[in-house]
Amino acid sequence: MIQKVQIRTNPLITFSAVLHIGACAAVFWQVWLWPWALGVVIADHLLLVGCGLLPRSRTLGANLSRLPDAAAARGEIALTIDDGPDPLVTPQVLDLLDHFAAKASFFCVGTAAQGHPDLCREIMRRGHSIENHTQHHRYNFSLSGPRSLHREIAWAQSTLTNITGHKPHFFRAPAGLRNLFLDTVLIRLNLRLVSWTRRGYDTINRDPEKVLKLLLHNLRAGDILVLHDGNAALTRNGVPVILEILPLLLASVRGAGLHCVTLRAAMEAVVDVPAAPVPEPDFPLPHLIPAARGATL
């Protein structure tokens, strides 16, 4: 059965609230203390913003940046693929994964999924998982308040569930950036935040060798890797970086005695529960072709 997410109290946020109350009380007690109180409040806000700019930080709440020890002991790593599905790139990624008998977790954007529902279902059919990467993938996501965060994530949750018939269990913020409100929103939606152990910056880095080096440097069991099938940077030959490096990456993983699994498989306590799908129009899967769209940041 699915483990329910327990309500958590973040010590930093509690401290921040106490700090604000203390600053107000100090000014009320002695008005001349206002410059000091203002400075303390500003410093606190800068700290909170800074924590949100660190994708792997746990300061603002629970954050999975590595697989559990049990998964690492089994020689598992998690390959996560963001920003899709892309009708030109994703089918080729799926074929490469099949060739190496590797599984991946696709963090899909709701609008992209709506445009290619059959491709989402194909991802699931081949034994991979689809997780939540927001509805629109806006880069100002981390500037949103609680209501906006909830609406954007819940919208994607509904979109992806209706298309695939399975609820996402994990969430990743655009570019990994977040704020102090996100943890509470994810608790309410019963989602778990996932960042990564290492990434290759393959949306902006056009050099496959550099991307591969970043992903393989000190690679070990339990790592979570990030690549992109959507918004993929193109090599000088016009090939999406993920397609250039994925065979080499998967071969290296196999050579190291490791194997790629979905996040759901690695997290043994999380079990997939089918949900009633909402009928969607059928679109034929695109043919596999080498060309791909240009990269965007």
Q: Model features per residue range: what roles?
A:
Residues L94-C108, H128-S129, G145-N179, T184-R192, ...:
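CE4/NodB-like, metal-dependent polysaccharide N-deacetylase domain
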Residues H136-Y139, R199-G200, N231-L234:
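A short, flexible beta-alpha/helix-coil linker loop
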Residues I81-D83, C108-G110, N132-T134, A173-A175, ...:
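A cross-domain feature marking catalytic cores of carbohydrate-active enzymes
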Residues G50-L53, S57-A72, N237-L297:
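C-terminal domain-boundary segment and adjacent tail
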Residues L177, L182-N218, L258-A269, H287:
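His/Asp/Glu-enriched short active-site or ligand-binding loop at hydrolase and phosphoryl-transfer sites
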Residues M1-S65:
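N-terminal membrane-anchoring alpha-helices
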Residues G52-F141, W155, T159, H259:
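Active-site beta->alpha N-cap acidic-glycine motif
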Residues G84-L88, C108-P117, R138-R147, R172-L180, ...:
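Acidic-and-aromatic substrate-binding clefts and catalytic sites of carbohydrate-active enzymes
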